[in-house]
Regions:
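Glycine-rich segments within core transmembrane alpha-helices of 12-TM secondary carriers
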Residues: 159-178, 184, 306, 394-404
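Residue-level signature of mid-helix packing/kink "hotspots" within the transmembrane helices
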Residues: 35, 63-71, 139, 173-174, ...
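C-terminal ends and interior cores of transmembrane alpha-helices
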Residues: 91-120, 334-348
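C-terminal transmembrane helical hairpin of 12-TM major facilitator-type secondary transporters
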Residues: 323-373
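Extracytoplasmic gate region of multi-pass secondary transporters
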Residues: 37-41, 256-311, 370, 404-405
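Helix-loop-helix hairpin linking two adjacent transmembrane segments in secondary transporters
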Residues: 165-218
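Cytoplasmic membrane-interface "Motif A"-like loop-to-helix N-cap segments
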Residues: 79-90, 319-333
């Protein structure tokens, strides 16, 4: 760091790297206990007789509660210790997954074993409660990360380094679909419960590691704050009052038209992303004739391509567009629509490499905006409100599960997968048009704060 002496700079870089790696691993594990559901769905449908519409309702309720939780926890995380917040939240998510896996046993114990209507209803109700609870607890994952990263990474480096960090989404989702794909391939439809038990055990262990590895801010380890990022807002050593904080949030988040545009765009980005991620195994097996194990691998490759897309989009944003992440998103959404169209047009007997290439190209494109929206929101709101801004955009993002969850499930069940593909393409185009609305916006809101 330019403003620090050599020893301080060395210590700062060590803690910066440690924070990035620890939060990457931690957030990947949040996906272990969230995206395991998509691979368990076909088994639950076969083994338990749960309909696609009901499974889609689980996804929708989980997503809505998660989006609301991210918003609430975003406001809280800006003013609390991120280390405790993230570690405890991950541990509780793991416990909720353990409980979900025991749903059949719980309903059988309470109402007697069998396949009666009452037991089925009780089991579905218990599953729904546990998955909604998990959705709420998942909201303790990203907000503390947004706080940590904006305190440890300078704004001019944020797009590149946070794009690297954002690969945790794809690493976590990719690894868990491979793991659960293997479980379902090995145990068959009845193995769905192990898709919850095994990821939960891994995540609980990870929560302990997070608690040991993380620290909240540079000052908590005796290091200076990054200059030029509003660190001076605690003037004369006085703590910011609640009224001052609320006024700042109104101006930089809730009354900021750029944050609203990013939030609305996030709604469309997440519909496309979750349509593939949540329904991918079912869609690929039913519309393209792949086995569940191979479908799991293809969804994992979609995630891996997303990693490359995030890294490239972050690098291109800083290198060519001077940090204007919203401009990169325009091109990414156009590419997403194009490659989903190509994938849709491939026949069920098409070579696997063609299916691979087109779906991976779509993943490469859609994960650029998924990563960059958080970066753009953090920069526009400044680090004082980074978690709140990301919670707000996340609220819109996970409201998208109304469409990608129960909406897409009902559309596929009643009209077929062809209509679902058309919906995804149209939504990607709308998302591109929303991003175009802020084409001329500046890269961040720090300059405005210093005027």
């Amino acid at each position: 760091m330019e403003h620090m002496d050599q020893d301080t700079s060395k210590r700062f870089k060590y803690w910066q790297t440690r924070t990035i790696i620890a939060t990457m691993v931690g957030y990947a594990l949040f996906y272990f206990v969230r995206k395991n559901f998509s691979l368990a769905m076909p088994g639950m449908e076969t083994d338990l007789g749960i309909t696609k519409t009901s499974l889609g309702l689980f996804l929708t309720l989980n997503g809505l509660v998660y989006g609301l939780s991210r918003f609430v926890n975003g406001i809280l995380a800006d003013r609390m210790n991120a280390r405790y917040y993230m570690a405890i939240g991950l541990a509780l998510c793991a416990l909720a997954n353990f409980a979900f896996g025991f749903a059949e046993s719980v309903s059988g114990t309470l109402l007697g074993w069998g396949i009666g209507k009452n037991q089925m209803q009780a089991m579905i109700l218990f599953m729904g409660v546990m998955w909604v609870l998990n959705g709420f607890l998942q909201g303790t994952g990203f907000p503390p990360c947004a706080r940590l990263l904006t305190h440890w990474i300078p704004p001019k480096e944020l797009a590149t380094k946070m794009s690297v960090w954002n690969t945790s989404h794809s690493i976590g989702a990719g690894l868990v679909v491979i793991l659960c794909g293997y479980i379902m391939g090995h145990y068959g439809a009845g193995g769905w419960k192990y898709c919850f038990f095994i990821p939960a055990a891994i995540s609980f262990a990870g929560a302990i590691v997070l608690f040991i590895a993380l620290r909240d801010t540079p000052t908590s380890v005796g290091l200076p704050e990054i200059p030029g990022t509003g660190a001076e807002y605690k003037k004369d050593g006085k703590k910011e009052t609640s009224a001052e904080n609320k006024a700042f949030l109104r101006r930089k988040v809730f009354g900021n038209p750029l944050i609203w545009i990013l939030a609305i765009a996030n709604f469309f980005v997440y519909i496309v992303r979750f349509s593939v991620l949540d329904w991918g195994p079912t869609l690929l097996s039913q519309s393209k004739g792949l086995s569940l194990e191979n479908a799991g691998w293809l969804v994992a490759l979609f995630e891996i391509s997303g990693i490359l897309g995030m890294l490239f989009s972050g690098w291109a944003t800083d290198k060519f567009l001077k940090g204007r992440a919203h401009r990169t998103c325009v091109f990414c959404m156009l590419g997403s629509a194009l490659f989903i169209f190509i994938f849709w047009q491939l026949p069920s007997g098409a070579p696997v490499w063609l299916l691979f290439a087109s779906l991976c190209a779509a993943g490469f494109c859609i994960y650029g905006p998924q990563a960059l929206i958080g970066i753009a929101a953090a920069n526009q709101a400044t680090k004082r409100a980074a978690a709140t801004a990301n919670g707000f955009t996340g609220l819109f993002g996970y409201a998208s599960t109304i469409v990608s969850g129960v909406g897409l499930g009902a559309l596929a069940q009643h009209c077929g997968w062809g209509y679902a593909y058309v919906a995804m393409i149209g939504i990607a185009v709308i998302g591109m048009l929303v991003f175009l609305m802020m084409w001329n916006a500046k890269a961040d809101g720090y300059e405005e704060e210093q005027v």
